Amino acid sequence: IHPKAEYHKRAYVTKKFVSDFNERTGNTVQYLEAPYEPNEYRKLVRGLEEEPEGGDRCKVCFDYRLDKTAQVAMDLGFDYFGSALTISPHKNSQTINSIGIDVQKIYTTHYLPSDFKKNQGYKRSVEMCEEYDIYRQCYCGCVYAAQAQNIDLVQVKKDATAFLLDKDVEKDYSHIKFTVTKLDI
């Protein structure tokens, strides 16, 4: 997600949502944050910068994200991994699911195919964003997609930085951070 301040803003908003959701529902959903590695992404998509939305650059991104998710899921002993990307009307669920199914072949965890936009899923996501006061971003996070959509990344950075000014991204909502407990059996 570019710029870095936008990454931190989205992470903070996600943690707030998880905390609020748990409080309202009595659930104990936890949050696990991926490291910020924009240079790794840029290396992977080098030569694909001009690809259109949904093109080969997106496929490389989906593969990278799903592979990282599967690695973590396997390391933590989860039976399944999945993606919320399929909620977006701008993302092809069949492509994402096909990549997820390919990725699962190299791990001991399974991909859970989804199409969250179906059955009014996208509409429900908009309703939940209003209900939980969730920030809805105007682009996926890809610097190249943002540029193609003429998104003012300087303004995005300013807005995200202003949002984060009075936030402690490390301590706020630390109670929902995923913790790993290894059992010796």
Predicted regions and their residues:
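Nucleotide-activated chemistry modules centered on ATP-dependent adenylation/adenylyltransferase
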Residues: 1-185
